[in-house]
Amino acid sequence: MTIEEDASIWFNVVIRGDNDPIIIGKRSNVQDGSVLHTDLGAPLNIGQGVTVGHKVMLHGCTISNNSLIGINSTILNHAKIRENSIVGANSLITEGKEFPKNSLIMGLSLIHI
C-alpha cells in the first residue's frame, strides 16, 4: 500500500491490499467508514486530489485525478472513473464499467450525463 504526500485517511477506514497493491494519490482523502480492497489482478488506484466520501466501497478499481466519489457508493473490479468526474451518492458502478473524463455518474451506472 502506498499513501502519497498530503493524503488523508479518516476514522474507521479499512484498507486491504492483501491481494494486489493499493495506491492513494497526493492530496486525496478517504472519509470515515470506507473500505478499500483488491482482488488478484485488480489493484486499486486512487489518483491525486480525489475525495472518497463516507462509507464508500472501492474494490479493485481506478479513480482518476480530481474526482469525487459520493457517500455510500460502491465501485467494483476493473471499473474506471476518469479525471474530473463525480459519482453521485449511493451509486453502484459494476465490474469493468468505464466512464470518460468530466462525467457525472449516478445510480446503477446505467445513466451517463
Could you tell me what each predicted segment is?
Residues 1-8, 12-14:
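Extended, small-residue-rich solenoid/repeat segments and analogous flexible loops
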Residues 18-34, 38-48, 53-111:
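Glycine-rich hexapeptide-repeat left-handed beta-helix
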